From Swiss-Prot:
UniProt protein name: Septation protein imp2
Pfam families for the chain: FCH (PF00611), SH3_1 (PF00018)
Bias-annotated ranges (Polar residues): 380-389, 450-472, 570-583
GO MF annotation terms: cytoskeletal protein-membrane anchor activity; phosphatidylinositol-3,4,5-trisphosphate binding; phosphatidylinositol-4-phosphate binding; phosphatidylserine binding; phospholipid binding
Alphabetical UniProt keywords: Cell cycle, Cell division, Coiled coil, Cytoplasm, Cytoskeleton, Mitosis, Phosphoprotein, SH3 domain
PANTHER family referenced in this protein's UniProt entry, alphabetically: NOSTRIN, ISOFORM H (PTHR23065:SF7), PROLINE-SERINE-THREONINE PHOSPHATASE INTERACTING PROTEIN 1 (PTHR23065)
Region described as Disordered: 353-472, 489-602
Compartments, record wording: Cytoplasm, Cytoskeleton
Residues with PTM Phosphothreonine: 531
Domain F-BAR, first and last residues per copy: 16-269
Gene Ontology biological process terms from the UniProt entry: cytoskeleton organization; mitotic actomyosin contractile ring assembly; mitotic actomyosin contractile ring contraction
Residue ranges with Low complexity bias: 357-377
SMART domains: FCH, SH3
């Protein structure tokens, strides 16, 4: 039987509720909402199983940690480190107890909550479903009786019409029989019509009752659904609070360990170890030659000489230097989601360490790498293709507005030789941070805190290039520094190879620029696992003056470091742009001597800037880096402004070169 739905066109769209949107000609809404109870039961059971397994994991973790805290280790340790080890064991035991308590709370407040809710839901279902099912069955039975009465009445009506149509076609006895049947059917149709009307009235009453009951049931079912969703939100919220409490308890335990370590003095421990375990200060001398032929007889005494050595000054700047080293994140940890983006407070241990590092820098301590860095120009990260040696006419001719030319003009303005003092940043110790309020680089890497404050400049911190002593120092120390890399021939210079060659070039690093974003999916462009401390400043060493030129550079504009590129060669004089007044850099040292000994190169001819020794082990996190072990000697080929250097391990294939953190090494003299 076809169903035709009629709506009042003037009525507005009903509100979104169960009582308005769960109807249907064949009771589709009734079946949809009642089947929801089965879905909810399945959902609750899945979540209960999940939290049950999570509580078991927490309990197993707590038991294993408690077992670990009862193990015996470092019994031979001495000094305050022995006390720190005991504190660590006690705090690990506290962590185990905390996690065991959390596992119990997960079982009581989370897992068992689903069991209690399932029992409550079962009672509600029994009460609601049983009532509406009776009404629904009564409606169905009345509707079936209506259909049966309707079919019977329809059949009798068809028979009456048939007998009436036969009256004009029959005669005699056949006509009499037809009329008798017609009278009998007419009597039956009267009773059938009465039954049919009664069935319609009964169905009308059952539909009215069904509409009221189902509307009320829809409201109750919607209340149950809303209550269920609030329950799930509450349970998941409780779960997160318990896990957060566990992490907070662990952090408090770690903070107590850190505070104990802050009180530990390595120097004092060493002195106490010497007092407790020293074996004497006498150095036994080698045995003498006894001439038995002359009657010399050795005695049993051992000749001792008092030891009075002076220990070489250590490179460690303070007793807490190992704590200043930033934690090296693994490649997996670097790519995980950064929940530390909104760190509320800096841990006290990190704050104290940054304060120590800043104080050491402010007290005049320069970086142990300063003597090494001050000899070379740091290479900034590239953002444009390499620009080779440009002919003088190209420099003096009008330029277009290309990005490369604009960058060169901008840098030439910053390096123009005018009579103004140039500012030089104060050098900072490796691993130190600009101020005590700045987190270590691993936190900056996550993007959670503002960038470090700019370092202060002093007006008289940079010596004037004009002074004769300064020019002589430049000529002696940095005569060939700017030719330290073998560059590919620039397209600009190649097209002008027959013209005069300018001594000043725009120098770019050929290494790809590392993106700061941690969302890159290219493994070779992942963010650094470690930013090696504060960026070393560009120590001012000026430019080399051509002895044939009588023009000396002046400092009129302050030097501004550029991240993308910088101009260390192409400089115009302040005067008129006359090419004859330009400074020129000799391609080779003025002494004319052989530089092959003083300037070692790699097998491919690239200049080796110096050598460093590894202080720690380091494993490469991305293909652009190299791995080395503590004590390895590394030849340095390039220096970058972000604190990463490029080189290779001496003794290995020098083609296997890559970048490494500069605060993992120290300078050595070769």
């Amino acid at each position: 039987m076809s169903q035709q739905l009629s709506f009042n066109a003037s009525s507005a769209k009903p509100d979104k509720s169960f009582s308005n949107y769960f109807w249907g000609a064949n009771d589709e809404g009734y079946h949809a909402l009642l089947s929801r109870f089965s879905d909810v039961k399945h959902i609750n059971e899945e979540l209960r199983s999940f939290y049950h397994e999570r509580a078991n994991i927490e309990e197993d973790y707590a038991k294993r940690m408690a077992k670990l805290s009862r193990t015996t280790f470092s019994s031979l340790e001495t000094g305050c480190l022995k006390e720190s080890v005991q504190v660590m064991k006690a705090e690990v035991d506290n962590m185990a107890k905390s996690h065991l308590q959390i596992s119990q709370l997960l079982q009581d407040d989370v897992e068992n909550a689903f069991t209690r809710y399932a029992a409550s839901l079962k009672d509600k279902k029994k009460m609601i479903v049983s009532g509406i099912e009776k009404v629904h069955k009564d409606k169905l039975s009345k509707h079936q009786a209506l259909v049966k009465a309707q079919d019977k009445y329809h059949y009798l009506c068809k028979k009456v019409n048939y007998y009436v149509s036969q009256q004009n076609m029959l005669f005699g006895k056949e006509l009499e029989k037809n009329n008798a049947k017609l009278n009998k059917t007419q009597n039956a149709i009267t009773a059938s019509s009465s039954d049919y009307q009664s069935a319609v009235a009964a169905v009308r009453d059952s539909y009215a009752r069904w509409t009221n009951e189902w509307r009320s049931t829809c409201d109750k079912l919607q209340d149950i659904e809303e209550e269920r969703r609030h329950f799930l939100k509450s349970v998941m919220w409780t779960f997160t609070l318990l896990i957060s409490r566990s992490c907070f308890n662990d952090d408090q335990a770690c903070e107590r360990i850190r505070k104990n370590l802050e009180q530990c003095s390595v120097s004092q421990d060493v002195l106490e170890f010497i007092d407790a375990k020293s074996t004497g200060t006498g150095i036994p001398q080698p045995p003498k030659f006894y001439d038995y032929y002359k009657g010399e007889v050795p005695d049993d005494s051992v000749e001792l000489v008092q030891a009075n050595f002076q220990r070489a000054q250590t490179k460690i700047e303070n007793d807490n230097m190992p704590l200043n080293r930033p934690y090296v994140l693994s490649a997996t940890a670097r790519n995980e989601s950064s929940f530390e983006n909104t760190l509320p407070n800096t841990p006290s241990a990190i704050q104290s360490l940054t304060t120590v590092s800043s104080n050491s820098s402010q007290n005049g301590r320069s970086s142990p790498k300063k003597s090494f860095l001050s000899k070379f120009k740091l290479t900034s990260r590239p953002s444009t293709p390499n620009v080779g040696n440009t002919a003088p006419d190209a420099l003096s001719s009008p330029r277009n507005d290309s990005p490369l030319t604009s960058a060169a003009d901008e840098q030439m303005k910053h390096l123009s030789l005018q009579e103004e003092p140039k500012q030089n940043p104060t050098p900072a110790a490796p691993g130190a941070f600009p101020n005590s309020n700045t987190l270590p680089p691993r936190y900056n890497e996550l993007g959670s805190l503002p960038s470090p404050n700019s370092v202060s400049f002093t007006e008289d911190s940079r010596p004037n290039v004009n002074t004769p002593s300064r020019r002589q120092q430049i000529q002696e120390e940095f005569g060939s520094v700017l030719q330290m890399e073998n560059r590919a021939v620039s397209p600009v210079y190649d097209s002008r190879k027959n013209g005069s060659r300018s001594s000043f070039t725009l120098r770019k690093s050929r290494s790809p620029k590392r993106p700061s974003s941690s969302l890159s999916q290219n493994a070779s462009r992942l963010p650094r696992s470690l930013t090696p401390g504060n960026l070393e400043p560009n120590y001012d060493f000026g430019v080399r003056v051509d002895p044939a030129s009588g023009t000396a550079p002046t400092d009129d504009e302050p030097y501004t470091d550029r991240d993308s590129s910088f101009v260390d060669d192409t400089i115009n004089t302040k005067a008129t742009g006359n090419t004859s007044n330009r400074l020129s850099l000799p391609a080779y040292p003025t002494d004319g001597g052989d530089t092959s000994i003083d300037n070692p190169t790699s097998t491919d001819g690239q200049r080796i800037l110096g050598y460093v020794s590894a202080l720690y082990d380091y494993d490469a996190a991305i293909p652009e880096e190299i791995s080395f072990r503590k004590g390895d000697t590394i030849a340095v080929l390039k220096l970058y402004e972000d604190g990463w250097w490029e080189g290779f391990v001496v003794g290995e294939d020098d083609h296997n070169r890559g970048q490494f953190p500069s605060n993992f090494v120290r300078e050595i003299e070769v």
